[in-house]
């Protein structure tokens, strides 16, 4: 079972590993704001941007690790308009294809929900285009609010 932890900063090695997870997910057809083929440079630039936001507390980054290293990640976007302090957005739920069907996504989701509760968030919002991901969220009790 993968272990989940929150990262407050990213090392260059972690950025490279997360870039690999992102590239794998995009290659596998994930709808996560990037098109295939995704270059390693572009993937690393994305994670560097995430790393730059972590110290400010506007974004929380969780990673799932197995004996080989990082196999999944999810983010909570915590900065919301002043009339929505109760809300956070769940973003970039990524699980490497080699680690799927092992409970990594469910473990990441539960950890993100717990972190949100600890931060006083009572509403979590996400979007997904994946039937597999939609089933994961439904099993965890999430409700569909609309289709775009």
Give the label of every model feature segment.
Residues 103, 120, 141:
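Short glycine-rich hinge loops at helix-strand junctions in the catalytic core
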Residues 96-98, 102:
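Active-site acidic-Proline motif in GNAT/NAT acetyltransferases
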Residues 109, 116-129:
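Conserved GNAT acetyl-CoA-binding A-motif
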Residues 5-92, 96, 109-111, 115:
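Acetyl-CoA-dependent GNAT
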Residues 125-127, 138, 143-148:
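Conserved catalytic-core motifs of GNAT/GCN5-like acyltransferases
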Residues 102, 106, 110:
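Residues forming the Rossmann-fold NAD(P)(H) cofactor-binding site
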Residues 100, 124-135:
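Conserved beta-strand-loop-alpha-helix junction that forms the acyl-donor binding cleft
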């Amino acid at each position: 079972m993968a272990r989940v932890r929150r990262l407050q900063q990213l090392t260059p090695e972690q950025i490279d590993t997360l870039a690999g997870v992102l590239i794998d997910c995009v290659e596998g057809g994930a709808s996560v704001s990037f098109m295939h083929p995704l270059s390693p440079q572009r993937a690393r630039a994305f994670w560097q941007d995430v790393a730059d936001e972590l110290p400010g507390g506007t974004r929380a980054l969780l990673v799932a690790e197995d004996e080989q290293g990082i196999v999944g990640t999810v983010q909570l976007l915590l900065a919301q308009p002043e009339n929505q302090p109760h809300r956070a957005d769940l973003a970039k739920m990524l699980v490497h294809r080699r680690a799927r069907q092992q409970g990594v996504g469910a473990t990441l989701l539960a950890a993100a929900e717990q972190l949100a509760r600890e931060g006083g968030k009572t509403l979590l919002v996400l979007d997904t285009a994946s039937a597999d991901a939609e089933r994961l969220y439904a099993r965890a009790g999430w409700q569909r609010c609309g289709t775009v």
